[in-house]
Every structure is written in structure tokens, then in C-alpha cells.
Amino acid sequence: MSRRGKVYLNARGKVEAGRRYTLSEALALVTDTARAKFDETVEAAVRLGVNPAHADQMVRGSVVLPNGLGKTVRVLVFAKGEKEKEALDAGADYAGSDEFIEKIKSGWLEFDRVIATPDMMGNVGKLGKILGPRGLMPNPKVGTVTFDVATAVKEVKAGKVEFRVEKAGIVHSPVGKVSFGPDRLMENIQALIEMIIKLKPATSKGTYIKGIALSSTMGPGVRVDPLDLRNL
């Protein structure tokens, strides 16, 4: 067995099969079982009582995590004139219009998030087959299609994450780095859960948040007792 396999099995052995932990216990386990030589990302998987096949039960949104994500986010803004300047002044890594559309068509993808002013979406939409599958297409529902580019850039740089429920009814979202420690990760998770609850569809009946699991990049999943979220 490889060393990596042994490390993972040792970490998994610390997590009791079938047990649902309190959020604080789960975070302590996630940080304790992270053994990679890099600063692992911590991800939350939230299982919801919705049917994403129904348009009126789609859950999609964004939230600015209070402690950020612990990584540098490269932001591209599609804008012209004064809005282009506002974007750059706010900290955008790249801002412009047609020149960046052509670069992307040629294979350039050295950015992590994309923002666009509404008047640019006619041209940006032509990049749908490139940006869409990568989750990079700007969308007004998450605030990335806006004339207020300065605020949008600052929020993304500060740790804004976008999320949407998948076909299986699960929302996946990063919530920070292992190096944050349990307390800062807790604050980020609270912000995420509060936003997901705020976006509960009116047509969702029964239990809304059915389960939560936390894990680091290379670590085992740790299940959280949804009832513990009542204390958030």
C-alpha cells in the first residue's frame, strides 16, 4: 500500500462510520485528519430537500464568506469605457471587451471568475461553450452581471462564492483552508448555511437541509448532524 493510502486510511479510522457529529466536532476532525503537504481546501456538501428538476425548486446564489477562501482569485471583467476603469481601480486583474473575447476564443483561460456589464452580455454570450462548462459564465442571479463592477470585483476578491444545487439535490461549496482553524471555518460555514436557508424555495416541503458533510481535499468525509444547525 502506498504511503498516501496508509495516511488516508489512518485519517478515515478517526471518523466513526455512520456517526453524525456536531459542527464543531466535525470541523475539529476535518482539520485533524488533513495530512497533505499543502494547505488543503475544506468543502461543504449540503443535501437539500428539493427537486432541482423543477424550476421552482432550483437553489442558486452567492455569499461573501467573512474569512474569505484563503487564495488569490484572478478576476476578468468585460466592460468598456468608465466601467472598465472602475473595474481595474477596484482590483480586477483584467478588464476590457473584444480583445479578451478573442483571447479566450484562442484558448486563454488565466482567470478564475468573470464579471460583465449587462451591455457586454451579447458578445460574452458567444463564449458560452467555453465559459459555461467551466462555471465561469457571468449570471445576474449571482451578481456577476452588473453595472456596479467595483462592488462585484471587491466581493469576489474578498471571498465571494457561487453555488447551485446539483441534480442529486446537493450544494457543494468551498469554505476555506485547513489553516483557517475550526473557528474561522465555522464562521464561513455559518454564512453559507444562512444564505442557503434564505434561498429556500416556497415550494420545498418537509425537511429542507437533510444532511451536511465536510471534508478536506485529501481527507475523509465527516457527516454533520443537521439538528446541530439550529444553534447557528
From Swiss-Prot:
One of its GO terms (molecular function) is structural constituent of ribosome. Keywords: Repressor, Ribonucleoprotein, Ribosomal protein, RNA-binding, rRNA-binding, Translation regulation, tRNA-binding. Pfam families: Ribosomal_L1 (PF00687). The keyword Ribonucleoprotein applies. InterPro entries: Ribosom_uL1_bac-type (IPR005878), Ribosomal_uL1 (IPR002143), Ribosomal_uL1-like (IPR023674), Ribosomal_uL1/biogenesis (IPR028364), Ribosomal_uL1_3-a/b-sand (IPR016095), Ribosomal_uL1_CS (IPR023673). Gene3D superfamilies: 3.30.190.20, 3.40.50.790. One of its GO terms (cellular component) is cytosolic large ribosomal subunit. It comes from the Bacteria. The keyword Repeat does not apply. GO terms for biological process: regulation of translation; translation. Transmembrane segments: none annotated. HAMAP family: Ribosomal_uL1_B. Part of the 50S ribosomal subunit. Belongs to the universal ribosomal protein uL1 family. Binds directly to 23S rRNA. The L1 stalk is quite mobile in the ribosome, and is involved in E site tRNA release. Protein L1 is also a translational repressor protein, it controls the translation of the L11 operon by binding to its mRNA. NCBIfam families: rplA_bact (TIGR01169). This is Large ribosomal subunit protein uL1. It comes from Syntrophus aciditrophicus (strain SB).
